[in-house]
Amino acid sequence: LEFRRVLFRSPPKSTGRELFNLPWLEARLNGEKPEDVQRTLVSFTAETVTDAIRNFAPHIKELRVCGGGAKNPLMISELALLNPDLLVTTTADLGVDPQDVEGLAFAWLAYRFDRRETGNLPSATGASGSRILGCLYPA
């Protein structure tokens, strides 16, 4: 029930291992073969991404995948199959290693902080206004 509150909520939203984890999954399994579980999880992920695109970003023309999913050819092909009108690739096609995106995002936030520039996008985060993010604690 908790996962439904997260999945069907309007953006901004986020979740991770605090909700979707091995104990959560094991509680729902009834002897299914590991390969069937993996395939189901790929389909579930691709379908939730597709639903989010259709509901909240129907105007996009490209989907650039990063993180662990970018290494999964089945995930990429499933996303492409479910989104035939989109160019579905990884951020590698932009010259950015899919595993580096999070680190680069934090570097960008640090750069913005150092220049005393705002680092959030209220329309994406739900914040009440633009803010300078972070703090500096000299040693």
Kindly label every feature range from the protein language model:
Residues 1-7:
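Short, small-residue-biased leader/transition segments that mark boundaries at the very start
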Residues 10-11, 15-54:
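Adenine-nucleotide phosphate-binding core of ATP-dependent small-molecule kinases
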Residues 43, 92-139:
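Glycine-rich phosphate-binding/hydrolytic loop that grips phosphoryl groups
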Residues 43, 47, 70-74, 83, ...:
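Alpha-helical interface subdomain recognition
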Residues 60-82:
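Glycine-rich phosphate-binding loops at beta-strand->alpha-helix junctions
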